[in-house]
Regions:
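Feature for peripheral, non-core segments
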Residues: 1-108, 112-243
Length: 243
């Protein structure tokens, strides 16, 4: 059974994105369907069938050339009192979870470690991330650890930032200001870097915190365990490492 991976989807979108920016190609956004549905309370769901496509074209009233475009992601505003999930590369539903946020400063962060109480239960975020360190994830006083990704540029915010979506882009070496910060973030990204640890089974019978050993073909990963009532409830990463 085949799976259409996110990497495949990204490659496809990139081809469309690049194609749409060619001076020899034109992409249009159309509006139509002025006549009422047979049942206004039960509008049919589009199926993408050949018939649906034909009817949509026949019902076009106007079309506008798309001269500017951007990749976007679902917008999740950072809000005090909200529980956020740390990014998990083994979570099949990660795209539906709030593992990244955008703040009122238009800074975008990814959560690499959520906060938990002494019993290991997730707690809410109460301290807004505001750092722009392009190299390191930062742990805040509420226990959440955030990695700065980028700041939405003013022009991108004006063109593409909406209540539901936020623009995403790649920075290049010619940029300055927040664009240069994002370029530094991109260059500092290390595939396979350990940024957080998730406890799936805390075991039992511990009289003191066990030593944590991270095995892999990288270097520098170090972590510390914390126990409550003889059970491991947290493992805190002591540093960002390439393991």
């Amino acid at each position: 059974m085949a799976v259409i991976t996110n990497d495949f989807k990204r490659v496809t979108l990139r081809k469309i994105f690049d194609d749409a920016q060619s001076v020899t190609n034109r992409y249009y956004i159309g509006i139509g369907k002025s006549e009422p549905w047979n049942d206004a309370e039960a509008v049919p769901t589009p199926t993408g069938s050949i018939r649906d496509d034909r009817l949509a074209r026949q019902g076009l009233q106007a079309a506008k050339s798309a001269s500017n475009l951007s990749f976007v992601c679902t917008r999740y505003n950072w809000t005090s009192g909200t529980i956020y999930n740390a990014f998990d590369d083994n979570d099949l539903t990660i795209g539906d979870n709030t593992y990244y946020v955008i703040t009122e400063d238009n800074n975008v962060y990814v959560c690499v470690q959520e906060a938990r109480n002494s019993s290991g239960v997730q707690t809410a975020s109460t301290v807004k991330p505001a750092h722009t360190d392009p190299l390191k994830a930062v742990k805040l006083s509420d226990g959440y650890k955030w990695k700065y990704l980028y700041t939405v540029l003013t022009t991108d915010a004006s063109n593409f930032l909406s209540a539901n979506f936020a623009p995403v882009r790649l920075a290049d070496s010619s940029e300055t200001g927040t664009g240069a910060l994002q370029y530094a973030v991109q260059n500092a990204a290390v595939r396979g870097q350990v940024l957080g640890v998730k406890v799936t089974n805390g075991g039992g019978g511990y009289s003191s915190a066990p030593t944590v050993t991270i095995e892999g073909d990288g270097t520098g990963a170090a972590a510390t365990a914390s126990i409550t009532g003889s059970v491991v409830t947290h493992i805190f990463l002591d540093s960002d490492a390439d393991s």
